[in-house]
Curated annotation (Swiss-Prot):
This is DNA-directed RNA polymerase subunit beta. It is an enzyme of class 2 (transferase). It comes from Thiobacillus denitrificans (strain ATCC 25259 / T1). Signal peptide: none annotated. GO terms for molecular function: DNA binding; DNA-directed RNA polymerase activity; ribonucleoside binding. One of its GO terms (biological process) is DNA-templated transcription. DNA-dependent RNA polymerase catalyzes the transcription of DNA into RNA using the four ribonucleoside triphosphates as substrates. The keyword Nucleotidyltransferase applies.
Length: 1359
């Protein structure tokens, strides 16, 4: 069993009873693959598939002019290189993007030629705007901030049949409807009303009888009836009227007269119901026709037009009802045969026939006119416009597209075998939909479930971007078509025709402000992954919160293994925003698939197949926890399975597939909760959501009890640094790791060195700290894919969101009432929950009307202490500790000339001009903030001279880059000279430095005596060897030139002016690191939805302690467990205690330092790791590795209890016993204040507890005086506005109830909106006279004005 570099250092004991057949796939694959398919970068023009950008271009081009004399054709496109890398874009506030250029061809036809002849062709590359590029971690950098495009779950194109569940009509009758939804174009609805007449509507406009649409499609009334009805045939002869018998149609009917056989024997008596027996008898008797009375025919409906053969006169029309007069007419006209529609009340309704009666259009054109009037009311219908509109509705490629998915779903639903076809609708398609709808109304067939994941598909980034790009191109197309007519006469080139602005505007708008383009949640690595794996039903073309009903939000059986049933927000978005399940992926059509193991001949194989929700319902699928024997066959006679979205028990021989893993049904966040199977679903939901809010701690600590997904989550999130290639570590410091690559992994002619620059103290989107720490030391040998540096919230390559705390479940003086949390002061002293938050403060110097603003140190009225910290450029020094109100960047703004007061005149006389014509607009630290300045960045517009600070920042960056290049050059040189030495050793020479004699052999001593660069001057006798020496020399020189060019390019980039917004001359960004310690009011939570607020931090000596004197870290209320039903936290606590106990045991073994310590450790590890669950290959570890493992496990042996396959009670007891702890998990605690034992034993153990991003420091806020609202003159609200506390209606009631009239008066006047009163109070306080004179509150004046505006005169009279 191969272990990675970090796994070997700290093995996690897994209790999984079954091995995963399929490793967890790369978690960000959906985003990355979708965008890769959109760009199709790196593919040649001929290899590109018709998707993404390619599809957008080919769907719009070629563009023809109105006269057809010129056309613009698309050839290919290519993406350029981005100007700035990701980090530079973030610093400068730019978008990380690449220029897109399309090669187009302008073809001009010869007008004079009789047949189409090409006159000239011009080909050219045209700039089409910038396309944002995706970072390797699946996000986008837009205007300097990281954003994520969330995938959208929308209704798949195709045809859907449903009914109104009896809600529309008071009778509760089911009204059936069908809807054809295209990917792009008009929606077509068909619906029955309460009178069983079938209507259609386009784009939810006015409804019209469906026969109008059929007539517009070219059907006559006769052909309509022919398409939808079976016929009964009647003959008129001398015997009267005879009826051609179709026995099957008579079942269930009541005979209106005696039905006799050939021998006049009565088979069915009058008024009796005809049964299957009667039908068999009729068949046997060979009755084909029988005579019927006239009333049997009356009331039936004619199926076709009836024409008098002699005169050619129309006797009756199709769909006319037969009356006695009409029968006489038919007989008189010599009609000997006619057909009627076969209908009955049970399963052959006369719906189309009734609809045809309500329709008064006469022919195809009249029907089209009716549709035109419905679509464009008030416009005069001309023949061309009428025909064009009808064709454009559903039959034009430009206006209508079902898409490949829509066509596949459509054909599948209407029962066709082929799944491909055109994107537009055909007459047959529309008729097929109407037929199915009529069948549904007749009681045959099933309606569709719109919440089934086979009817909802995912639109990922690539597809959403493609739609926007196409929308931009459509705007371009209109402009190009206008200009094409001039192309010939004005001799224009393609770039004159195409204006790329609409395209870039559409793309920019989508990435910048679309509802699905969201500011990335970057609190910790898990929140990043979850955000990128999110699927939302909201957004353009999706649902809205208000309209979404309960059914859409509910968990559906098809969510199994596709969408997580647990992780979704609480509140208005519940069920509309979901997370992809752990193993889910989207297929080519956009439907979510989940993997299954194939079962062949009762044996579960390791062959994996992905099934979508549509395919899955056909198979019987066993769950992952089904018991298998050694051969992979099912042990039980009945196995719990799923079939047709129902849970059922099935015999093993019927099973066709089996789940891949027990964790298959949940998302990443839910799969990180150990013992999830013991938690109530509501609490599991809160647990999944709160893990995403955990703030990275200063020293991350791996969870003692995890699930085994921690490593996958950390690696896939991109927060840890992964080795791209194997090699040996050459150099390590806090900021970079240099690795000399193994020869077999280095490509020819390439530098065999990888340099990883680590991210140091960088601000995330949520102001948390991202910092990477190296895990390797010089000389370590690492393989490809190993974790070489930890990031935020990771510990040795594993996700570590919180800290392991010693927890006791007991009440403590009411301080843990209602979920409050009691914390040991030691936790704060040891900085266990201290986190660093980085605030970015920026200031810009603009060019104003009165002159440019200036960033300077020369500011009047600034205290010496403040000035001392600013450098000569007026910018604060890095490392300075600052508090609220301190100046960070000095800035002055020119001030307009104003009338000077005598005092100002005096100041001007003393200090000269400068003092009065500028005002101080320096960047100061906002209220309530303090910290340390950790970085400063200065951006200067092109053409404006840089100050010394800006220059020194550039110099530092260049020096760092030079250091990187020098390292790479050093390794290249070492590598080259090592090869050269091997080549020269013991070779015969013709001569060389230090008078080397011809014919002598080169010794190692001789080479050591020379400078390495002089080795190239040795002249070898062997020509081939000489050529190799020359080749090495050339490649070394080439590398040096290459590196010099790279340095120059970097220098050029840094020294060039920065792109800044218009009018901005200079911008300075200052980064503050703020240390936040744990304090009362901070919110904390476990992973099981158990959240609370810190109520008190108790001195160590007062905390309850164990018999060995160890005080507990946290005291939680035991009443928080039973009603919430999240028992997982108790099991975690027990197993966490075992983990710590085993760690201490290992520590004791290591401390004993006996000779046999390695042997003892190896034996103990086998006890821990190999008695149950997944076995580990302990024998494969070397003695040094065993010792290092022991060293790392002293704090605690990490356990993995995978979801739905976790540790059993027996296994937890066994681990507690192995650690020498009580198996019950309870122990006697002593009161820290009295030293007495508590009455009964208390559950104690270790639990992973998180500090959440709801910190009291961010919420606490106080105001003295501040801004007021303009209209009401009341203080603004909220911390951001530096607002006041609202004294609302209920608070007023409270004071009224107390009778505190003076307090109430000042609350409603001088402390709020009595403008004069509050100024007076301020003056009085200054004078030392503490009087209050309350006046009229401004809001009363507003009320008076409101009443006057209603036309009611209101005046105040003084008494």
């Amino acid at each position: 069993m191969a272990y990675t570099f970090t796994e070997k250092k700290r093995l996690r004991k897994s209790f999984a009873s079954r091995t995963n057949t399929l490793p967890v796939p790369f978690l960000l694959a959906t985003q990355l693959e979708s965008y890769r398919a959109f760009l199709q970068e790196g593919r040649s023009r001929d290899e590109r598939l018709n998707e993404g950008l390619q599809a957008a271009f080919t769907s719009i081009f070629p563009i023809e002019s109105h006269s057809k004399n010129a056309r613009l054709e698309y050839v290919s496109y290519q993406l350029g290189e981005p100007v700035f890398d990701i980090k530079e874009c973030q610093q400068r506030g730019l978008t990380y993007c690449a220029p897109l250029r399309a090669k187009v061809r302008l073809v001009i036809m010869d007008k004079e030629a009789s047949k189409p002849t090409i006159k000239e062709v011009k080909e050219q590359e045209v700039y089409m705007g910038e396309i944002p590029l995706m970072t390797p971690t699946g996000s986008f950098v837009i205007n300097g901030t990281e954003r994520v495009i969330v995938s959208q779950l929308h209704r798949s194109p195709g045809v859907f049949f449903e009914h109104d569940r009896g809600k529309t009509h008071s009778s509760g009758k089911l009204l059936f409807s069908a809807r054809v939804i295209p990917y792009r174009g008009s929606w077509l609805d068909f619906e029955f009303d309460a009178k069983d007449i079938l209507f259609f509507r386009v784009d939810r406009r006015r409804k019209m009888p469906v026969t109008i649409l059929l007539k517009a499609l070219g059907y006559t009334p006769e052909s309509i009836l022919d398409a939808f009805f079976n016929k009964d045939t009647f003959y008129i002869n001398t015997l009267g009227i005879q009826f051609e018998l179709v026995p099957e149609r008579l079942r269930g009917e009541i005979a209106r007269f005696d039905i006799c056989g050939k021998d006049d024997k009565v088979i069915v008596a009058k008024d009796k119901r005809i049964t299957a027996k009667h039908i068999r008898e009729l068949d046997a008797a060979g009755v084909k026709k029988w005579a019927v009375p006239g009333e049997f025919v009356v009331g039936r409906v004619l199926a076709h037009d009836v024409v008098d053969k002699d005169t050619g006169e129309l006797v009756a029309r199709a769909n006319d009802e037969i009356t006695e007069e009409l029968l006489k007419k038919l007989a008189a006209a010599g009609i000997d045969k006619f057909q009627t529609l076969y209908t009955n009340d049970l399963d052959h309704g006369a719906f189309i026939s009734q609809t045809l009666r309500t329709d008064d259009t006469t022919d195809e054109y009249a029907a089209k006119v009716a549709i035109y009037r419905m679509m464009r009311p008030g416009e005069p219908p001309t023949e061309d416009a009428v025909n064009a509109l009808f064709v454009n509705l559903f039959f034009s490629d430009e206006r209508y597209d079902l898409s490949a998915v829509g066509r596949m779903k459509f054909n599948r639903r209407i029962g066709r075998d082929e799944l491909t076809g055109t994107g537009t609708l055909s007459t047959e398609d529309i008729v097929a939909v109407i037929k199915i709808l009529v069948e549904l109304r007749n009681g045959r067939g099933e309606i569709d479930d719109i919440d089934h994941l086979g009817n909802r598909r995912v639109r990922s980034v690539g597809e959403l971007a493609e739609n926007q790009f196409r929308a931009g191109l459509v705007r371009v197309e209109r402009a190009v078509r206008e200009r094409l007519s001039q192309a010939e006469s004005d001799n224009l080139m393609p770039h004159d025709l195409i204006n790329a602005k609409p395209v870039s505007a559409a793309i920019k708008e989508f990435f910048g402000s679309s509802q699905l383009s969201q500011f990335m949640d970057q609190t910790n690595p898990l929140s990043e992954i979850t955000h990128k794996r999110r699927v939302s039903a909201l957004g353009p073309g999706g649902l809205t919160r208000e309209r979404a009903g309960f059914e859409v939000r509910d968990v559906h059986p098809t969510h199994y293994g596709r969408v997580c049933p647990i992780e979704t927000p609480e509140g208005p978005n519940i069920g509309l925003i979901n997370s992809l399940a752990l193993f889910a992926r989207t297929n080519w059509y956009g439907f979510i698939e989940t993997p299954y193991r194939k079962v062949v001949d009762n044996k579960v194989t390791d062959e994996i197949e992905y099934l979508s929700a549509i395919e899955e319902s056909k198979y019987v699928i066993a769950q992952a926890n089904a018991e298998l024997d050694a051969k992979g066959k099912f042990k039980d006679d009945l196995v719990s399975c799923r079939f047709k979205n129902e849970f059922t028990l099935s015999a093993p021989d019927r099973i066709e597939y089996m789940d891949v893993a027990p964790a298959q049904i949940v998302s990443v966040a839910a799969s990180l909760i150990p013992f999830l199977e013991h938690d109530d679903a509501n609490r599991a939901l809160m647990g999944s959501n709160m893990q995403r809010q955990a703030v990275p701690c200063l020293r991350p600590e791996k969870p003692f009890v995890g699930t085994g997904i921690e490593r996958t989550a950390a690696v896939d999130s991109g927060t840890v640094v992964i080795a791209h290639r194997g090699g040996r570590v050459d150099y390590v410091d806090a900021g970079r790791i240099v690795i000399r690559v193994h020869d077999e992994e280095a490509r020819a002619g390439e530098v065999g060195v990888d340099i990883y620059s680590l991210i140091k103290y960088t601000r995330s989107n949520q102001n948390t700290n991202i910092n990477q720490r190296p895990l390797v030391k010089v000389g370590d040998v690492i393989a490809r894919g190993d974790v070489i540096a930890d990031g935020a919230s990771t510990d040795m390559g594993e996700l570590a969101l919180g800290q392991n705390m010693l927890v006791a479940f007991m009440p403590w003086n009411g301080y843990n009432f209602e979920d409050s949390i009691l914390i040991n002061e030691k936790v704060v002293a040891e900085d266990r929950y201290t986190s660093i938050h980085i605030e970015e403060l920026s200031v810009v110097a603009r060019d104003t009307k009165l002159g440019p603003e200036e960033i300077t140190r020369d500011i009047s009225n600034l205290a010496e202490r403040q000035l001392a910290r600013l450098d000569e450029s007026g910018i604060i020094a890095i490392g300075a500790e600052v508090e609220a109100g301190d100046v960070l960047v000095g800035k002055v703004t020119p001030k307009g000339e104003t009338q000077l007061t005598p005092e100002e005149k005096l100041l001007r006389a003393i200090f000269g001009e400068k003092a009065s014509d500028v005002k101080d607009t320096s960047l100061k630290v906002p209220s309530g903030m303090s910290g340390v300045v950790i970085d400063v960045q200065v951006f200067t517009r092109e053409g404006i001279e840089r100050d010394k600070r800006a220059q020194s920042i550039i110099d530092t960056q260049l020096a760092e880059y030079k250091k990187d290049l020098t390292d790479r050059m050093r390794i290249v040189e070492d590598d080259t000279f090592a090869r050269l030495e091997k080549l020269l050793h013991l070779k015969v020479v013709n001569g060389g430095p230090k008078k080397l004699a011809k014919g002598s052999k080169i010794s190692k001593e001789y080479l050591d005596s020379l400078n390495r660069h002089d080795w190239f001057d040795i002249r070898l006798a062997d020509d081939e060897a000489s050529r190799q020496v020359e080749s090495l020399k050339d490649s070394l020189t080439q590398k040096r030139v290459e590196f010099d060019a790279m340095f120059e390019e970097k220098k050029q980039k840094l020294t060039a002016g920065d792109e800044l917004p218009p009018g901005v001359q200079k911008m300075v960004k200052v980064y503050l690191a703020v240390k936040r310690r744990l304090q009362p009011g901070d919110k904390m939570a476990g992973r099981h939805g158990n959240k609370g607020v810190v109520s008190k931090i108790v001195p160590v000596e007062d905390m309850p302690f164990m018999a060995d004197g160890r005080p507990v870290d946290i005291v939680l209320n035991p009443l928080g467990v039973p009603s919430r039903m999240n028992i997982g936290q108790i099991l975690e606590t027990h197993l966490g205690w075992a983990s710590k106990g085993l760690g201490e045991k290992i520590g004791q073994m290591m401390a004993a330092q006996t000779k046999s310590v390695v042997k003892e450790l190896r034996h103990f590890f086998k006890e821990v790791y190999n008695q149950s669950g997944k076995a580990e290959d302990i024998d494969n570890f070397t003695d040094d590795e065993i010792l290092e493992l022991g060293q790392n496990l002293q704090k605690g042996v990490p356990f993995a209890s995978p979801v739905f396959d976790g540790a059993t009670e027996e296994e937890i007891r066994r681990m507690l016993a192995l650690a020498g702890l009580p198996e019950g998990g309870q122990v006697t605690l002593y009161d820290g204040r009295t030293g007495e034992a508590f009455d009964r034993q208390v559950t104690v153990g270790y639990k992973h507890v998180l500090k959440l991003h709801h910190l009291v420091d961010d919420k606490m806020h106080a105001r003295s005086t501040g801004p007021y609202s303009l209209v009401t003159q009341q203080p603004l609200g909220g911390k951001a506005q530096f607002g006041g506390q609202r004294f609302g209606e209920m608070e007023v009631w409270a004071l009224e109830a107390y009778g505190a009239s003076y307090v109430l008066q000042e609350m409603l006047t001088v402390k709020s909106d009595d403008v004069n009163g509050r100024t007076k109070v301020y003056e009085n306080i200054v004078k030392g006279d503490h009087k209050i004179e309350a006046g009229m509150p401004e809001s009363f004046n507003v009320l008076v004005k409101e009443i006057r505006s209603l036309g009611i005169d209101i005046d105040l009279e003084r008494y």
